[in-house]
Amino acid sequence: MKAVRNLLIYIFSTYLLVMFGFNAAQDFWCSTLVKGVIYGSYSVSEMFPKNFTNCTWTLENPDPTKYSIYLKFSKKDLSCSNFSLLAYQFDHFSHEKIKDLLRKNHSIMQLCNSKNAFVFLQYDKNFIQIRRVFPTNFPGLQKKGEEDQKSFFEFLVLNKVSPSQFGCHVLCTWLESCLKSENGRTESCGIMYTKCTCPQHLGEWGIDDQSLILLNNVVLPLNEQTEGCLTQELQTTQVCNLTREAKRPPKEEFGMMGDHTIKSQRPRSVHEKRVPQEQADAAKFMAQTGESGVEEWSQWSTCSVTCGQGSQVRTRTCVSPYGTHCSGPLRESRVCNNTALCPVHGVWEEWSPWSLCSFTCGRGQRTRTRSCTPPQYGGRPCEGPETHHKPCNIALCPVDGQWQEWSSWSQCSVTCSNGTQQRSRQCTAAAHGGSECRGPWAESRECYNPECTANGQWNQWGHWSGCSKSCDGGWERRIRTCQGAVITGQQCEGTGEEVRRCNEQRCPAPYEICPEDYLMSMVWKRTPAGDLAFNQCPLNATGTTSRRCSLSLHGVAFWEQPSFARCISNEYRHLQHSIKEHLAKGQRMLAGDGMSQVTKTLLDLTQRKNFYAGDLLMSVEILRNVTDTFKRASYIPASDGVQNFFQIVSNLLDEENKEKWEDAQQIYPGSIELMQVIEDFIHIVGMGMMDFQNSYLMTGNVVASIQKLPAASVLTDINFPMKGRKGMVDWARNSEDRVVIPKSIFTPVSSKELDESSVFVLGAVLYKNLDLILPTLRNYTVINSKIIVVTIRPEPKTTDSFLEIELAHLANGTLNPYCVLWDDSKTNESLGTWSTQGCKTVLTDASHTKCLCDRLSTFAILAQQPREIIMESSGTPSVTLIVGSGLSCLALITLAVVYAALWRYIRSERSIILINFCLSIISSNILILVGQTQTHNKSICTTTTAFLHFFFLASFCWVLTEAWQSYMAVTGKIRTRLIRKRFLCLGWGLPALVVATSVGFTRTKGYGTDHYCWLSLEGGLLYAFVGPAAAVVLVNMVIGILVFNKLVSRDGILDKKLKHRAGQMSEPHSGLTLKCAKCGVVSTTALSATTASNAMASLWSSCVVLPLLALTWMSAVLAMTDKRSILFQILFAVFDSLQGFVIVMVHCILRREVQDAFRCRLRNCQDPINADSSSSFPNGHAQIMTDFEKDVDIACRSVLHKDIGPCRAATITGTLSRISLNDDEEEKGTNPEGLSYSTLPGNVISKVIIQQPTGLHMPMSMNELSNPCLKKENSELRRTVYLCTDDNLRGADMDIVHPQERMMESDYIVMPRSSVNNQPSMKEESKMNIGMETLPHERLLHYKVNPEFNMNPPVMDQFNMNLEQHLAPQEHMQNLPFEPRTAVKNFMASELDDNAGLSRSETGSTISMSSLERRKSRYSDLDFEKVMHTRKRHMELFQELNQKFQTLDRFRDIPNTSSMENPAPNKNPWDTFKNPSEYPHYTTINVLDTEAKDALELRPAEWEKCLNLPLDVQEGDFQTEV
């Protein structure tokens, strides 16, 4: 058996030598590992018990982050002539790394080469190793010397931050011993540690020199007894027990057990005196106190582990019969070594950074590798691939045309005699800007055959020729020749040609071919549907661009938008080349700084927003290269660089780049690559952070959190994102998405790694719109949530804990939402796909979905999208929209045609506003139909949306303009040209301002979508229409309330002061109303009634049209944006057509002015003042009169003519100036057929009836005008005179009709028209002579004279009116027109003209020239050419004047007794007039019959009582305010 055992040992040793080599076998048997020790001293023989070379002694640092190892080497008595001692440190215990370290000979200390007696070393890494190396061919030490037994090595584990008293004491002892040995030379005894301060004498520590010797040749393990030796100050629970000395075991107990040295010690107090060795041995197994109650130690327990270093424990009990306590420990432990070695499994190192793309253009490959630490002692090898590849595609390379191989030589052209042979080659098509092939494509050579025989024979068939057509069926042919026919003359039998059909596919129709197009400075040639056309990229980019010709749903070919996925801007390409230049520097810091500069440049480029789709892929590639460079160079970017990185990502993920991403991802899924780059960058940043440090990065589209957390410090769950964090962007703060990371997940994969040094890097990212740019899913599946990412490095251990994720839905109406995570192991190219494995949906509702996932990844919510939600553009509007818009436009066009035909009669502000309103509605209807057909054309759709927005708002604004015009008419505001321009600014200017502002802010983003040509419903752009429209409706309601309140005010009097003074009147100013409507003269009451009627019509129109308009456009918006619902289209058709008919009904059929104008149009009425219009308007064209200007014009032409001598001229002249009328005012004609034109003022008066007062002969001064009311009976007799000035009755004869007494009738006068004939004075005097000949001869006077009335013929040569000097130069030639602003002079001339028919006696008896002079002087300073600016002032003057003359008529008519006594009329009362026979063109006017007279009779004002209204003619009543 012994022989067998020896044989097995020999075989096993031989096997080890063969497998591992001799040196490896030596390393296996002479390696020592020491760990769990805080202090120790060793000799060379203890460290290297075997006499082999390359033996090692390794010391492990308990925690490199907390402790440092100090090593003392005493060379004084050691001879290093036969070997070398190497000292070095490393982090990972790997034989390959140690060999690599020895090969580089970097940071290795040669201890034997030191010139000093002591060598002090400090190490901060995980392992310290000392290696003994013999020279080559040295047999080794044969025996051990005495110096091998001495302690030459001492080490100490010392706390970095707060060293212990024990540690500092040991360091100071080393220093003191060095100083003593070197005789005070301090330069060779340097220990660089500033935390300890050594005392001048060691006794100050309380430890004597004798006790220090006891620490030599001992080892202090790290246990409960020595725990206090590592702390600065001892706590109550810590001890530094050195009360007993444990000597090393004897030689027979000391040996090697595996690769660990067994060392034992007995703690000893540093205060204890040295005792003899025999006493110590005697007391070794006795109780420290010497009491009999302490039992002996038990046997050592078995080793705690079966392989590697373990521990053994022994205990004892205390039995104290006398109630005293036992002293000393009751439990001891020691290190035990086991001969069995623990297997070490193979471990993969970190992946190397991705290499650059193997090609600069075209499809290349990126590679990364990793190395495996080989297993030891039977461990498992590494599992998984060593190399990882992935594709990369930067840009397409230009491909030159290449000649293919030559074809084989054809057969000889003849089968006999000499002929030729041909061969050809083909050229592959050049692509992406490559050059064509160069050189010939065919070659020929001679062939030699035997001479031809006598009989003809067919040769072989040739190749088929090319097809004659490329489509719709062509023909191809092949031939063969007959050999020997020339010699023998006999033809071969059969045919020498064959034909067959080819290319029978159908040719595309003309409408299936995209025509040649010029777009973006590129010409796109004709291309059939389904094919691609290629072009060179623009000048600022390289590569090729493509454009597809597709078929629409109706089978018509159309060009799609060009694809720029293969175009890369020159700036991006230069930036990519600069990365290679930085990498070529070869220095870590320079490369890292260069990458930071690259990110700054890339940030500037991405912020310009003018890049191509290919630039997005290039940007992702640049970010990947930057990240890999940071990782390869172990470079930690600064905070600015990190912020720039995430800002670049945010710029790339902007929603504006959605179409570019869709274009780019047809070539390569760059968005998925971008997610992986961000995760790698997060861990690079996290590894450079301090413990417990976190960083929040917030941008417009990305929110990221990076935290570095020790495993032991994670006490609570982690929530992301943090809503209340300062500076959080709004979209993330308002987001309802969150993820809860449980604390239990922070557990390493290996349980041995779980200690205080385990640190995790946690990264979490929330993307705002990454779902928009990810590749489109199939089967109508969409991403219905934001995307959130959670990643942790190193990878935590799989536990039963779940990540709780809650995501909000982005779109409503989706079906079957479920949770997914991104799994990158399900595709061949390592890109990944969405997977449901590892995630389960626990709760879902209409707006949220809650998930529980058992792994870290990228999470989202997928849902099914109903197919009917996808809206396809039909190309033509629906029939319902066409019918509704057509009916509305037809009604409004009809209204416009009617107004155009009657424009000369109904032209006014209200009519102009209506025409503009109709124009806006018609334009809106047309644009609605156009927008339904142009959804595929981006530019036309955007333009249509902008104009539709404008006309929608304009329709609302014109309704508001109509309400404003009504309000100004009711309140009496003056409407000048400036006001009318403000109407246009409100109707067209305000909508244009709103649309221009909206387009400017949005840059047309949202004006038109892929499905409809209207404002986008997303982003709040719709408020640009709803807001202004709602404001217009609100203001319109306010104006309507004000107008209605004004219309229902008391008595219709506008001025409150006049209303108070007027008192109670039955019919105020009714006596001023002529019953003859032909004259066109109305009273103030009639004017107010007309204004109120128009205002009420406008108010009623607003109340009906405005709600209908709002309903119409609301239904139009719904019909345009939701084409699936036919209900909205029907509602729009109903409301739109109803709106058109309502507008026609309100503004055409029911409008009184239109009715009157239409009747006049049917009777072919003409304007009698057309020939005279040029005199009124110097510019030769008419101007629209405002409602108030019409009122004033009527008032000025219908003022009561009071024939009271001098009072009349002064009073009326000062009162009836043509105030606030424009110079180019248009006067409208009177309908001779009897139509009422109360609303069309300024008509030429065809007939005027004047009732001559009875008291004309009665003298009356201005003082008498202010007398109180006279008795009624004093004014019963009146003489009436009817004056007709109709120009059509020029041939009328003069006839005096007997007077007919009419009681209580008022006297009236009508202002003359535009001209009067005045006879200029022959002498330049200050007086004006007015005679009968100055009267206009067109007039025919009919007087109804009372028989008692005595009228004497006037003598005109004695009738002189002494006017002031300022009236003298205002004489006119005959037939010269007066200016409208000279109405005062016109009126004076008319008054003098009428006075020419009075008798001399009446003139002399009734007119007091001195009184006239006095009154004229009072008004000489008045400036009657100034303009009044308020209608309130005008109405006040007009009403006050009429009230004064009404009062005068009632109280001044006192019968003259002298005149009544002589009732005989003068014999020659009308001698002054010429014979009517001299005017043959006149016709005689018949006496008015009873009906006509009733129609023309005057209605006097019947006052209820006498008014105490003084006739005040002070200047203050008639002064105008300028």
Swiss-Prot record:
Organism: Homo sapiens (Human)
InterPro entries documented for this protein: AGRB_N (IPR043838), CUB_dom (IPR000859), GAIN_B (IPR057244), GAIN_dom_N (IPR032471), GAIN_dom_sf (IPR046338), GPCR_2-like_7TM (IPR017981), GPCR_2_brain_angio_inhib (IPR008077), GPCR_2_extracell_dom_sf (IPR036445)
Topological domain spans for side Extracellular: 25-880, 932-939, 1003-1023, 1120-1125
Domain GAIN-B, first and last residues per copy: 693-869
Keywords: Cell membrane, Disulfide bond, G-protein coupled receptor, Glycoprotein, Membrane, Phosphoprotein, Receptor, Repeat, Signal, Transducer, Transmembrane, Transmembrane helix
Subcellular location as annotated: Cell membrane
GO (cellular component) term, any one: postsynapse
Annotated Gene3D superfamilies: 1.25.40.610, 2.60.220.50, GPCR, family 2, extracellular hormone receptor domain (4.10.1240.10), Rhodopsin 7-helix transmembrane proteins (1.20.1070.10), Thrombospondin type-1 (TSP1) repeat (2.20.100.10)
Residue positions the entry lists as glycosylated: 51, 54, 82, 105, 241, 337, 418, 540, 625, 779, 812, 828, 937
Signal peptide feature range: 1-24
Transmembrane segments: 881-901, 911-931, 940-960, 982-1002, 1024-1044, 1099-1119, 1126-1146
Region (GPS), start-end ranges: 819-869
Protein name: Adhesion G protein-coupled receptor B3
Post-translational modifications reported in the UniProt record: The endogenous protein is proteolytically cleaved into 2 subunits, an extracellular subunit and a seven-transmembrane subunit.
PROSITE patterns documented for this protein: CUB (PS01180), G_PROTEIN_RECEP_F2_2 (PS00650), G_PROTEIN_RECEP_F2_3 (PS50227), G_PROTEIN_RECEP_F2_4 (PS50261), GAIN_B (PS50221), TSP1 (PS50092)
